[in-house]
Amino acid sequence: MLGTRVTRAVYTRAPLKLQLRALGLHRRYVHNGSKNDEGSSTSTTTNKEENDKKLPDVYPQMLALPISRRPLFPGFYKAVVISEPRVMKAITDMVERQQPYIGAFMLKDSNNDTDIIHDISEVHELGVLAQVTSAFPSKDEKTGKETMTALLYPHKRIKIDQLIPPKDVKIEDIVVEKVVDNEVASEETKDEETVDKTESATDKVSEEITEEIAKAPSTEVTEDPDNYENPTDFLKDYNVTLVNVSNLEDEPFDIKSPIINALTSEILKVFKEISQLNSMFREQIATFSASIQSATTNIFEEPAKLADFAAAVSAGEEEELQEVLESLNIEQRLEKSLLVLKKELMNAELQNKISKDVETKIQKRQKEYYLMEQLKGIKRELGIDDGRDKLVDTYKKRVEKLNLPENVQKTFDEEITKLATLETSMSEFGVIRNYLDWLTSLPWGINSKEQYSIPRARKILDEDHYGMKDVKDRILEFIAVGKLLGKVDGKIICFVGPPGVGKTSIGKSISRALNRQFFRFSVGGMTDVAEIKGHRRTYIGALPGRIIQALKKCQTQNPLILIDEIDKIGHGGIHGDPSAALLEVLDPEQNNSFLDNYLDIPIDLSKVLFVCTANSLDTIPRPLLDRMEVIELTGYVAEDKIKIAEQYLVPSAKKTAGLQNATVSMDEEAINALMKYYCRESGVRNLKKHIEKIYRKAALEVVKKMSIEDTEPLVSTSEEPQLSQTNQNISSSSAEDSTTDLEDSVNPDTAKEASKPNNSQEGASVEETKKAVKTEEEEDTSMIVPEDIKVEITPEDLKKYVGPPIYTTDRLYETTPPGVIMGLAWTNMGGCSLYVESVLEQPLHNCKHANLERTGQLGDVMKESSRLAYSFSKMYLSKKFPENRFFEKAAIHLHCPEGATPKDGPSAGVTMATSFLSLALNKPVDPTVAMTGELTLTGKVLRIGGLREKVVAAKRSGAKTVIFPKDNLNDWEELPENVKEGMEPLAADWYDDIYKRLFSGVKKSEGNNVWKSEFELIDKKKKEND
C-alpha cells in the first residue's frame, strides 16, 4: 500500500495501524454480538459485562443521532422516532451489515426536532454509545409522514472529538498526510483504492489528490487488504452526520465512602416512597433490583448504576438530566440524581393528591346520583311524583344552550340545588321557579349579527323617512365605526323635536338598518323606580324591570331599546325617582354591570343601542342629559310636507281605506291647500289624520256610487284572499301595542304573515278562533272598484271632506298697523310666529302720565325684556329724534296674542323695541318681516337658540325677511337650502342694523313732528290750567 494517505482532517483519529486493528476488532465484535440484537428490553449486568468485553477501546467513525428533550443513560433502553429519510436508510443498512452502533447526543434546543447535526454547538458534546437493537417503520399520525422507530440500548458514555457534518467537501477541509510505515508495502494501485472518491468536493480537488498520490513513494502491503477496510465507510454514501469519539470512564471512588453510602441510602429511601405512590415506578424498581441482584447482592457496590437509574426513570428538566450524564464523579452524580428524584417525589405526591381529590368528588357525585335515583324510585312507587325532576331537567337543558358567565352559572347552580330540595307546596318553591324562568330566558351570549352595509342602511332609512339628514348621517357613522373596529358597542342617543316629526318611527328604521331587534317602552308619567330596576323577588308578584323584559323579548344582548317620552318622566314620587335609576342604564361606564333588583346579578348592557325621544330638554335632569348624545329634529317646511305626504302618507292612507285598487287621487295642490289652511304645525301627525279622514270619506263616496249603479261586489281573483278591513285594523292596532319584531320588518313574507289576525283570542279556543277568522274571510272579501268610478280630490273639495278651513290667511296680519311686529318663538311643538302688539291706551292729550301695561301671560323673563325694551326705546328715540316727546305722555299697552298660552324667554327683546319705536314714529313695519333676538340696554343684539325652528315657522307664516343676531349666522348657513329658499336674512349686531332696515324712510323732520299737534294741544291745556 502507498505510504502517503489523503483524507479529511477530521477523520484523522490515530495512526493507520491502530485504526486498522480497531476496525478488525470492531468487525469481530459485531459478528459475535449480532445474536443479542433481539434481546429483552431489560438490561442485565451479565449481558452488560459480556457486551463490555466485546466493545473495542477505539471506534471508527459512527453515525451521530441527535436526541431531543432528555438524554440516554447507559444500561436503559429508549425508543426514538426518526423522520429523516437519509438517517432511516443509513440505520437500516447498518442493521443489515451488523454494524448497529451510533452516538446519541442530546440537543441543546428542545424545540429543534431534527435528525441531522450541522454544527457541534447544536448538541451537548457528551453522550452515549448506543446499539440499535431493533428498527421498524412507523407513521406520523399528524402529518402522515413515513418515519422509523428505533430501540436503542446505551452502553457507555462517550465524548465528541470531531464532528463531520453532512456538507459538501470544501478545499480547506482537504489535507495531504504522509504516513511512513515499514510494515506496509508500496504499491500505487493499492493506494488508489484507499482513496474515497465519494468524498471529493469538486473535480479540481480530485485532480490535486491524484497528482499527490502519484508523487508518493511506493511500499508493499504484507497483510490481507480486507483487514484494512473501514466497516463504516458505507455511511458516507448517505450524507449523514458522522463523529469521531472517545470513551469516558467514571472517576475512581471508594465503595466504603460514608457520603456515597448516605446518598445511596437516601436515593433508596426516596425510591421506596415513590413506589408507594406510583405503581409504574414500583415495576421499574423491581426490574432494576432483579438485574442488580443477578450480578451482586449488595446495591451499595453499584452506586453509579443506581444514579443512572434514578435519572433515567425521573421526569426532570433537560439540563438537570444532562448534568447527571456528564458527571463522572460518582458522588456528584448521586447528589444530582437525588435532586432530580426528590422533585419526582414531589410531583408524585401532588399527582396522588389530585387523584384522591378527583376520586372523592366522583364518589360523592356517584353517591348523590345513586341516592337520587333511589328517591325517584320510591316516589314513583308511592305515587307522589311532583314533576320537580322534569322541571330541573328543563332548566338544565336551557342552560346548556346558553353561554352563562361564571358568576351567573354559580347562581344558577345554587338556585337549582335549592329547587331540587324544596317541596312544591312551599311558597319559596314558586319564587325560585319564577326566578329560574327569568334567569334561563335571558339571551346570555346571544347576539344578532351586525349589519355593516352602508348602502343597505341608507336605503332602509330613505324608504321609511324623508329628510332627517343629521339622524341618518349619525347612524351611518355608527355603522362605519363598527365596520372598522369589527364590533359595535352600545350608544345612547336622544332625539329632540316637536311632535309628529318621526322620532319614534325613525327608531324602528334604525333597528332594521342595523339588523337589530327592536323594543319600545314609554317612561312618560312613570313614577316607580321598580319599573326600571325591578322589584325584590321576595315580594309577591315581583318582576324584573323593563330593561330585563326587553332583553327577554328580543332574545339578543344587542337590541335597540327605544325609551319614549323621556322628558315627561315623573319626579319625586313616593316610590323613588325613575330618572335617577336611568342614570345607571344610560351611562356607558356603568351599564356593563347593570344590577336589576329582581335578578340581583350584573347584566351587561354595553352592547345595547339606547334611543331616547323627547320634545324638550328643559325637563330632563342635567346628569341624565349629559349621558346622552342629543340630535335635534326640526319641524318640516311646506316642501318637506308635500314630499312626505306624496311618498308616505297618501299611499298608506289609501291602502288603509281599501282604495289601493280604486281610482282615487289627491293632487299636489290639494295637499298644499290642506297644509296651508288646516295643518300648519311642525310635524306631520295632524296632516296624516286629515289625509286618512279624506280617504275614508272618499271610500264612502265610492261605495255609494257602486250601490247606486247596482254593481255587484266581485270576489277578488288574486291567489291570496285579503282579510277584511276590520281584521286589518285589529292587526295593526295590536301590532302598535306590542313590540315590533325586527325579522318581520326585514322579511316581507314574515311581515305579511304577522299582519294576519292573531289566532289566540281571549275567551275562545283555537278551533273557534280559526272558524271565526275563516267565516270573516269568506264574508268580507275585498271588492274590485270599476274603472269608471273615479274620485279626484281638489282644493275646492277639502271643505266637503275635512270641514271649513282653520286658517284663512297665511299671517295673522296681512297688513300690520303701527306697533304690531311679527316675532318668532320656540316651543315644544316647534317654532311659531308670535306677534307683539303695542297701542296707545288713549290719545296723548288725555294721558295724565306715561306708563306701560303688559298682558298675554308673559313670564318673568319676558316682562323684564319688555321693561328693558321700553327703556331702550325711550333712549333711542331721544337720540334719533330729540323733539319727539312721545314717551313723556304715552300710556302704552303691550300684548302678545293667544293669551291662554304662557310665554317666556329673552329672545323677544328686539321685537318689543321695534314695536315701541313703530308706535312712537307712527310707522307700520313690513308685514313680511319676522325677527328674533335678545336686546341689551345699549342696543347690542345677543345670540338666541332654536333658529332653525324659528326660520321654519317664519317661512310657514309667509315671511320673506328674517332678522336674527349676527352670532347666529353660522346656524343660518347650516340650514338646508329648501328652508332658506325665498328668505332674506339680516344678521344684526346692533339695533342700528335693524332700524336702518325697517325705518330708513323716516326723515328727521318727520320723526320729530309726528306727534307735534298732540303736544301743542297738551301745552295749550297746560297754559289754560295755569
From Swiss-Prot:
Keyword Transcription recorded: no
Domain of life: Eukaryota
Cellular component per GO, a single term: mitochondrial matrix
UniProt enzyme class: hydrolase
Transit peptide limits: 1-29
Residue ranges of domain Lon proteolytic in the record: 815-1001
Domain Lon N-terminal span(s) in chain numbering: 62-345
Free-text function comment from the UniProt entry: ATP-dependent serine protease that mediates the selective degradation of misfolded, unassembled or oxidatively damaged polypeptides as well as certain short-lived regulatory proteins in the mitochondrial matrix. May also have a chaperone function in the assembly of inner membrane protein complexes. Participates in the regulation of mitochondrial gene expression and in the maintenance of the integrity of the mitochondrial genome. Binds to mitochondrial DNA in a site-specific manner.
Protein name: Lon protease homolog, mitochondrial
Gene: PIM1
